[in-house]
Amino acid sequence: MKAYQQYIRNVDPYVPGEQPHFDQMVKLNTNENPYPPSPNVLQAIAAIPLQEQRLYPDPTAHQLNAAIAKRYGLQEDQVFSGVGSDDVLAMLFLTFFNGTKPILFPDISYAFYPVWAKLFGIPYEAIPLDEQLRIVPEDYYRPNNGIVFPNPNAPTGIALPLDAIRSILEHNPDSIVLVDEAYVDFGAESAVSLLPEFENLIVVQTFSKSRALAGSRIGFCMGAPELIRALNNVKYSFNSYTLNRTAIAAGTAAMEDEDYFQRHLKLVVETREWTKQQLAQLGFQFPDSKSNFLFVTHPDYDMCQLFTYLRSKQIFVRQQKWKPYWLPFGNFCKQNTRLDSKEKI
């Protein structure tokens, strides 16, 4: 067997969420926003001169990074952007997690973490959640070469309070701590406010969920200028031109439209709380999600059978290796369709 073949055999790739194409379906499997992005996004894209498409985009994504920095009260040299938060996280793993000690992350969490660790040859420990599916900060008070966790966690939707994140940072002053905030806008408290206190903290966010730009693939992280410089050095060693002109314009417009952002966040959160009430009345059990999805189980239903049944009704949820399965939700109309289907089981 050739060396590269053995290497590829050891790679266990991440399985992306299915993107089905049916006219009448309820798509709940990848946590997309049920609402369109800000109307300013379309205007910004339309304003790009066609002749500029022959030119490479700005490798620094200055326009976008400046908008992000302004929104979060930071300097531009504290912001790094990439092709979705997956691209940003992969670059962070490659840049900072290169020691002999293991990195730490929850065992029930974002499935890409162990994929990157194995791909880049990074030793890791998957730390179990407690019986209530919560991250326990004290479990991360051990020797490590870095820590990464989502807040809120995925797929549980449970959020760590800011004091718990502070505790993890205080007990790991020599380790980079990545807080993956893909879903933070739906009800958790962002760790961005801790950046002035901790130079080992990096906060990762995305435009895919709360800003409804999953199709544009825009992610970013925020941290100390020294860390962002190191990250850019690695980026420029791979691909200088990551974000295209359209994505930069779209992301900038979305970031600057705060009113639209807040109004539609409120709608998603209201729908989530309504869905919790409806599912509880049907006997479902779930943690208190602060994301835009729920992680549910039911004492009378087999989740594998429920997954198959919902799929037969063109209701697409994400099948996980963990049980119970989590069920993200769309808009109010889609919720009625989904709950009616469960009532017929």
What annotation goes with each model-predicted range?
Residues T95-W116:
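Conserved PLP-anchoring active-site segment centered on the Schiff-base-forming lysine
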Residues H62-P102:
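Phosphate-binding glycine-rich loop
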Residues D107, A126-D130, Q205, Q320-K321:
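Short beta->alpha connector loops at strand-helix junctions that form conserved
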Residues N200-L279, F284-P287:
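PLP-dependent aminotransferase class I/II
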Residues V269, Q281-K313:
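Conserved PLP-binding catalytic core of the aspartate aminotransferase-like
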Residues D163, S312, F316-I345:
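PLP-dependent enzyme catalytic core of the Aspartate aminotransferase-like
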Residues M1-L55, P143:
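N-terminal "arm"/small-domain region of PLP-dependent enzymes with the aminotransferase-like
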